[in-house]
Amino acid sequence: RRKEAGEIAEKYADFVVITELDPGMEDINKICGEILSYIDHKEKAEIITDRDTAVYTALKKAEGMENCVLVLAGGSDAYMKRGNKVYPSDTDGERVQKFLKKICK
């Protein structure tokens, strides 16, 4: 899936923020770096390992522009798997709503 994510981002996105999603026992930077390796134009991508910061950054970059922001893969999951632990987390929808309220004040 990482190769496909990078290739699709390269083909269709003007800008992409690569972030964590249930890294489990893998290093987050390694996962994000692997996705980035499939994006030829590195200037149109940024790695932000914290998902909250990544979503907020993507929304801020789109502010005041005619853009569409896609927040993919997390969906309605209200948890994040890191190592062998599961942590409570906002869903992607909750994240977007929270940050849009902040940005659109």
Regions found by a protein language model. Name each.
Residues 1-105:
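ATP-dependent carboxylate-amine ligase
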